[in-house]
Amino acid sequence: MSLLKTLKGQILVLSATCMVAALMVLTLVNYLSARAQAQVSLAEEGMATAKSHAETIEEWARAKATIIAASVAAFEDPEPAKSLAMLRDAGKFSTAYFGYADKKYVFSETRSLPADYDPTARPWYKQAAQAGGSVVTPPYISASDQKLVVTFATPVGAGAALKGVAAGDVYMESVVANVASIQPTPQSFGFLVSADGKIIAHRDQALTLKPIADLSKD
């Protein structure tokens, strides 16, 4: 009888131990599953947020490009500066201008430029002429006010019939602010990178136009 009691007790202890172990395993599995689901949920939320902001930026760029393309109608006006000023104000450009194939140019406001200024030698002119359609330049720091800008440009004519290029500059402040507002979680933040791997918008402004590889150095 004593032996049976001892054996029964051992079995009960073993059973209890197995139950506790099973509960611990189940608890761990549930924890890992919940954590994985939370991580998936955060990833999906982050992707949705990034997509939404990307669509906003794309729409912003599309609207600017459309306005510049429409300005071509005034390209051969006797006094295009008035039309350019209206375009600048309506499209919220910092400046709008025409560069002609004969190297003449007209801006939406009075500009003091070097006597040898040649619009056909400018990157925006060359990029639009080569593309044969509307383009947007890579972001760059404006020499006049040290602000981050991009240029939207559209060629007038093509090839041997190229008459010139219509263009407008836009400050990137609104885009940078939009990206800075991205924060799916308190520990995360958004940043914008160009197609050539340069940082356009980041919470650390010192990284502006730096290679994305610089982030790994921090």
Question: What are these language model-derived features?
Answer:
Residues L3-A36:
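Extreme N-terminal signal-anchor transmembrane helix of membrane signaling/transducer proteins, especially
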Residues N30, A38-S41, E45, T49:
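Long amphipathic alpha-helical coiled-coil rod/stalk domains
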Residues L32-Q39, A177-A180:
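Juxtamembrane transmembrane-helix termini
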Residues E44-T137, I182:
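Extracytoplasmic/periplasmic sensory segments of membrane signal-transduction proteins
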Residues P78-K92, Q127, V165, D169-K210, ...:
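Solvent-exposed, extracytoplasmic
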Residues Y100, G157-A158, S194:
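Short, acidic, Ser/Thr-enriched surface-loop or helix-capping motifs
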Residues K104-Y105, L162, K198-I199:
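Hydrophobic "anchor" residues
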Residues F107-I182, P186-F189:
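Extracytoplasmic/periplasmic ligand-binding sensor regions of membrane-associated signaling proteins
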